[in-house]
From Swiss-Prot:
Keyword Transcription regulation: yes
Protein function: Probable transcription factor involved in the development of floral organs. Required for the formation of inner floral organs (lodicules, stamens and carpels, or whorls 2, 3 and 4) and the lemma and palea (whorl 1), which are grass floral organs analogous to sepals. May be involved in the control of flowering time. Seems to act as transcriptional activator. May act upstream of the auxin-responsive protein GH3.8.
Keyword Repeat: no
Compartment(s): Nucleus
Species whose genome carries this gene: Oryza sativa subsp. japonica (Rice)
Annotated keywords: Activator, Developmental protein, Differentiation, DNA-binding, Flowering, Nucleus, Transcription, Transcription regulation
GO biological process per UniProt: cell differentiation; floral meristem determinacy; meristem determinacy; positive regulation of transcription by RNA polymerase II; regulation of meristem development; regulation of transcription by RNA polymerase II; specification of floral organ identity
Tissue: Expressed in lemmas, paleas and pistils. Weakly expressed in carpels.
Subunit organization: May interact with the K-box of MADS6, MADS14 and MADS15.
Protein name as catalogued: MADS-box transcription factor 1
Amino acid sequence: MGRGKVELKRIENKISRQVTFAKRRNGLLKKAYELSLLCDAEVALIIFSGRGRLFEFSSSSCMYKTLERYRSCNYNSQDAAAPENEINYQEYLKLKTRVEFLQTTQRNILGEDLGPLSMKELEQLENQIEVSLKQIRSRKNQALLDQLFDLKSKEQQLQDLNKDLRKKLQETSAENVLHMSWQDGGGHSGSSTVLADQPHHHQGLLHPHPDQGDHSLQIGYHHPHAHHHQAYMDHLSNEAADMVAHHPNEHIPSGWI
């Protein structure tokens, strides 16, 4: 018993409509392939689904060649030169076809819409993905090596800087220790020791100057703390002057002022 005739109208059920589209699309693509193979015909088939997805078949090596041949076959021979807007429209169609083809390829790479693909097309897609993965891994490894090299260079720079800072710190610490030792030993309790070690100098520290008639004190040895002695002597002179001012009738030894 043969199949009954199918009423040619839009299928309202969405799932049934998609199933019917897939079956008839595959059949149409198969017929186009058989026609080109059996009859040596140049066949180009372009199908857009209800959701705008592109399905195409071309018996030639490139769909664009067939489309260009179709465009050149102008049915109106009297109008050989197409208007500019027609040329632009044809260019738009080419670009649109190219974009839709790339979108379909992208979906296939993402694992979508693989149903219409044949075994050979699936193998080609698999090989393409494997090649892409190899290139991605190679680039990733190279980026990691470059990053590791940069980190090692920065580490070496930081080590050199740390070495210089440590050296400067040691030099500064040595200078501070020497300075503190000098202050503790020579600035406070060590002044007498320094003077005792140099008797031929400190004997003239409090010796009166020979050119002066009075007995004013003179500093004959320039010690690092000589300004402390000078300040002390100035203090004594000021006290003597105050005593003369407050007690003018009392006798003050001449060596005090």
